[in-house]
């Protein structure tokens, strides 16, 4: 039902099939803000799988990381609160341990989750973490990215744009105050 437009099998790889986890993971994102909800998770997971197959990534690390990368994001959090903070990492660790994954694999998944965020400004070291970061950033572009931007900005009560300088020609972008500034800070 929640896979509208996505074939569950399209997310599977030869190394890992996330299908059995999807119902449980979807319930973990019920309180997520609209920009980091389960549909975002599915898009990032699919993009990560596509890139990962081309780059020969370890899908047993990449796909669980993609599924759990925004765990802990709450409604209205947006960029005001790091979606994958310590609470999210703790929840991801508990989830993975509950699935019986080994310690080494769990640590690799958690590393990718921890460093994926644009706002952290960290350049990931592992291939899987770099792919997750790229897949997440790709979901911030295009029509979906624009929709996510304005949904989050609206939820946070931000003004749409700076009245005197909407295109940041004579000032630094401040996307904590104006939605349109987010394009200049992150997307352009």
What do the PLM-derived regions correspond to, one by one?
Residues 59-78, 84, 88, 109-119:
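His-Asp-centered metal-binding catalytic motifs of divalent-metal-dependent phosphohydrolases/nucleases
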Residues 16, 20, 63-66, 108, ...:
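Generic alpha-helical secondary structure signal
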Residues 29-33, 52, 71-79, 96, ...:
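Short amphipathic alpha-helical interaction patches enriched in hydrophobic/aromatic residues
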Residues 12-26:
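Short alpha-helical hairpin
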Residues 95, 102-130:
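Hydrophobic, well-structured mid-protein blocks that either form specific transmembrane helices
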Residues 12, 29-56, 68, 121-188:
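Divalent metal-dependent phosphate-bond-processing catalytic cores, especially two-metal-ion Mg2+/Mn2+ enzymes
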Residues 44, 84-96:
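An active-site-proximal "capping" alpha-helix that borders the catalytic cofactor pocket
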């Amino acid at each position: 039902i929640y896979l509208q437009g996505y074939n569950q099998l399209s997310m599977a790889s030869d190394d890992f099939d996330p299908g059995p986890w999807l119902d449980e993971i979807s319930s973990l994102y019920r309180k997520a803000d609209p920009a980091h909800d389960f549909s975002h998770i599915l898009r990032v997971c699919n993009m990560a799988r596509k890139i990962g197959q081309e780059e020969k990534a370890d899908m047993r690390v990449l796909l669980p990381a993609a599924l759990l990368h925004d765990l802990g994001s709450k409604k209205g959090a947006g960029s005001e609160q790091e979606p994958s903070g310590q609470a999210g990492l703790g929840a991801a660790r508990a989830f993975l341990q509950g699935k019986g994954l080994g310690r080494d694999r769990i640590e690799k998944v958690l590393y990718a989750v921890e460093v994926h965020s644009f706002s952290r400004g960290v350049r990931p070291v592992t291939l899987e973490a770099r792919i997750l970061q790229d897949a997440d950033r790709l979901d911030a572009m295009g029509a979906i990215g624009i929709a996510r931007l304005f949904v989050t900005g609206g939820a946070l009560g931000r003004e749409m744009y700076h009245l005197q300088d909407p295109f940041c020609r004579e000032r630094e972008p401040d996307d904590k105050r104006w939605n349109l500034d987010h394009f200049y800070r992150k997307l352009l």
